[in-house]
Amino acid sequence: IGDLHRGVPELRADSRYNRDTALVTSKFSIGVDILTVIAETKPEGCVDFEVMTAIDDFSWQMSNLEGVQSTIDLAGVARQLNAGWNEGSPKWRVLARNPSVLTQSVTYIPTTTGLLNSDCSVIPIMIFSKDHKAETLARIVAEVKRIEASPGHPDVKFRLATGNAGVMAATNEAVAAAQFPMLLWVFGAVAALCLL
């Protein structure tokens, strides 16, 4: 179930696209396979320290998972901007506890970045995987489901998934669920036809 090799399976392994994809994932911290987890929260959740900390912790856990190239989320960008507002000092690369300071960090992030919606009630976490092999996607999805099932912040709910890797993961789950019933129907039909 799913892909066994890196690259697009419709193309040859040495195709230009597959070579370019391998180069991008080996040289940069992003990849071409993206699974986006949607964090649903209350309106104006992006200026709530506890909500942003829950999203930052989730992103950190995902970025340390085997098969994940990197993650991008609003909390990480807000930490970078907070440092930028304070002369670029690494000591300030933190989430501010004060809502006014946190507002200063996220105000200039437009909704067109895909990191938040207009009322900050939806905050996507983009997970770039190293490849889209079935085992890699299953590992990422299992970790998201584990975190989702554990007791976390009451105002944050993590939802699977968008992006090309998210669609592939959902397809893999649907195929896995239908595999054995479909085989039973096929073998049953063949057996019934043999008895005729």
Label each PLM-derived region with a short phrase.
Residues I1-L196:
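Extracytoplasmic
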